[in-house]
Amino acid sequence: MFRLISFCWVLLLANPSQGQDINVLLKEASNFERVQKENEALEKYKLVLTQDPVNIKALVKSAELSASIGGRQGDKNNKRLFYETALAYAKRAWQADSNHADAAYAMAMISGRMTDIETENKQIVAYVKDIKSYSDKALSINPDHGKANYTLGKWHYEMVTLSGLKKAAVKLFYGGLPSGDLEKAISFMEKCKTLEPYFALNYLDLAKAYKEARQPAKAIEVLNKLVKLPVRTGDDPAIKAEGAKMLEAIQ
């Protein structure tokens, strides 16, 4: 018995608590994100998931980072691979805890990304519906979830401005176009701006919504703030550049 107890103590000393290891990995991942090393951050979150497969933070972050990295891929097949991987992480988060606002947001976020690569009309419409339903779910859990406010605002904006094949598909399979509302788009994205003041993509799409609403002064105000934002993610340089180009065109 004494030998068994001694052996157990050796194992405990050799392997620090799983929770401590996970906290260290999460901190390291966050540090990589702060310096825009998204691939390295993603690998750290994956390591967390090897120890805790239902860790919501790691699953949601893995979904976000996979989507972000995928969005910058020039090759369509690589983009699809990253997006489908992001969708798998989001689904795991949702299955782990469907009452977690971050899990619902992750499903809404990646559903939006999937509409950009999906070619089957019925599936495009299914993703469009999912953006709305999962955003609504996230906000029913936490009305102050910044990125869920953005995602729902973007959904309203896109329902107003849909064009081309995506518009035709939504009209055909949705039973008419959903009731997008430009005022709601602006309201949700303005709330996100308050809750997530460094989320560059929200500024860009909010400016587009103001432009669509024929409020150029408001669009210019938002764009002026966007171009002054610090770079926080790998997507930010391109977002800020697009904002600067849009600002030049409006002024």
Predicted regions and their residues:
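Terminal, low-structured helical/coil segments at or just beyond the last alpha-helical repeat
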Residues: 162-173, 179, 196-201, 220-222, ...
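Bacterial N-terminal signal peptides
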Residues: 5-14
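Short coil/linker segments at helix-helix boundaries
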Residues: 32-40, 65-99, 109-144, 154-192, ...
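N-terminal leader/linker segments that initiate helical-solenoid repeat arrays
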Residues: 17-71
